[in-house]
Amino acid sequence: KGLETTIAATGLTLVGIFNMMGTLISGRVSGIIKKKYVLSFIYFTRSIVIFLLLTLPTNNFIIISFSCLIGLLWLSTVPPTSGIVANRFGTRYLSTLFGIVMVSHQCGAFVGSYVGGLVIDIYGSLDLAWIMAIIISLFSAIIHFPIVEKEKSEEIFA
């Protein structure tokens, strides 16, 4: 949409910086609030941020704001997700199990990138891909609610 390259580069930089902050914050909050609720909040908020990107006029302020917000939400799912895996299955095989989670995530990232490219080729716009991202984020927010988290035990902290 005619974005200046310096704004795009700045936005990408801000995503990385805010990724670190979001991950630290979600890790801390996940120790206080049930991890499934933290994940649901992150995914729901992500859907709102993407919706706002689609509906607000595209300008430098919106792009910079979006970059900061999506950065906060992007990798912030990692601490609560690894916490849920540890809670459900213990820490003995946490590295292997979380490795499987991450490989699955990367496969999803490949599919998402590929589909995004197809959407541009077919429709000449990424709007449909953003709409799909909103739907997937809302779905993700919903499916985390039924997760049963065990009460904290010594094994989880090992």
Descriptions of predicted regions:
Residues 5-6, 91-101:
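Loop-to-transmembrane helix entry/capping segments in MFS-fold secondary transporters
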Residues 16-17, 106-107:
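Short hydrophobic/small-residue motifs within alpha-helical transmembrane segments
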Residues 23-34, 120-121:
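Helix-to-loop junctions at the C-terminal end of transmembrane segments
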Residues 37-52:
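Structural signature of the two symmetry-related core transmembrane helices
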Residues 62-76:
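Hydrophobic core of transmembrane alpha-helices in multi-pass small-molecule transporters
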Residues 76-89:
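Intracellular juxtamembrane helix-capping segments at the cytosolic ends
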Residues 118-136:
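A membrane-interface helix-boundary motif in multi-pass transporters
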Residues 131-158:
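Multi-pass alpha-helical transporter architecture, strongest
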